[in-house]
């Protein structure tokens, strides 16, 4: 009977891992693509294209195939009190859970702005998807351009 009350042991784990330290955040800030709107900033780094050195934290963390995304949340005290900051973090985590297939292979850092606290979940989701799709489109366009070779005159 006690086993019936417990949660299932094979409950799926979250499809993302979090960025752990300053060096990981700095790598996304410096090498990643930035996109801003009036509610938050999103920094995206294609972690699958990072060099696979042994000491590279992205390579070590993404070799587990179940953890296909790295997520970092940087919510400052300017956004609101602790309750509001935690609400924003919960919403952003659930967005990454809900749209895990779009985030696959990326390291994401969200930096919410003060106006983000007044958004409801559906509006936040709309802005998140618009930003992520535009970033992926830009990265694909940029990738196609760099792989093109030209004949020498």
From Swiss-Prot:
Please indicate which superkingdom the organism of origin belongs to.
Answer: Bacteria
The main enzyme category here is hydrolase
Question: InterPro entries from the xrefs?
Answer: Ribosomal_Su5_D2-typ_SF, Ribsml_uS5_D2-typ_fold_subgr, RNase_P, RNase_P_CS
Q: What sections of the protein cross the membrane?
A: none
Catalytic reaction(s) noted: Endonucleolytic cleavage of RNA, removing 5'-extranucleotides from tRNA precursor
Q: Which GO terms describe its cellular component?
A: ribonuclease P complex
Q: Does the keyword RNA-binding apply?
A: yes
Q: Which GO terms describe its biological process?
A: tRNA 5'-leader removal
Record key words, sorted: Endonuclease, Hydrolase, Nuclease, RNA-binding, tRNA processing
Q: What are the EC numbers?
A: 3.1.26.5
MF terms (GO), sorted A to Z: 3'-tRNA processing endoribonuclease activity; ribonuclease P activity; tRNA binding
Describe its function.
Answer: RNaseP catalyzes the removal of the 5'-leader sequence from pre-tRNA to produce the mature 5'-terminus. It can also cleave other RNA substrates such as 4.5S RNA. The protein component plays an auxiliary but essential role in vivo by binding to the 5'-leader sequence and broadening the substrate specificity of the ribozyme.
Q: Which NCBIfam families match?
A: rnpA
The text of the family note is: Belongs to the RnpA family.
Q: How does it assemble?
A: Consists of a catalytic RNA component (M1 or rnpB) and a protein subunit.
**Record's protein name:** Ribonuclease P protein component
This protein's species is Helicobacter acinonychis (strain Sheeba)
- Classification of source organism: Bacteria, Pseudomonadati, Campylobacterota, Epsilonproteobacteria, Campylobacterales
Underlying gene: rnpA
């Amino acid at each position: 009977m006690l086993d019936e009350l417990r949660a299932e042991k094979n409950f799926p784990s979250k499809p993302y891992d979090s960025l752990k330290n300053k060096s990981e955040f700095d790598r996304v800030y410096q090498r990643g693509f930035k996109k801003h709107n009036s509610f938050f900033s999103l920094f995206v780094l294609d972690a699958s294209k990072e060099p696979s050195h042994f000491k590279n934290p992205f390579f070590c963390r993404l070799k587990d195939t179940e953890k296909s995304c790295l997520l970092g949340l940087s919510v400052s005290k300017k956004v609101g009190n602790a309750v509001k900051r935690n609400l924003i973090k919960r919403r952003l985590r659930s967005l990454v859970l809900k749209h895990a297939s779009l985030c696959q292979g990326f390291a994401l850092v969200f930096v919410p702005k003060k106006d983000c606290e007044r958004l409801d979940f559906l509006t936040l989701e709309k802005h998140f998807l618009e930003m992520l799709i535009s970033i992926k489109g830009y990265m694909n366009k940029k990738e196609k351009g760099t792989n093109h070779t030209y004949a020498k005159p």
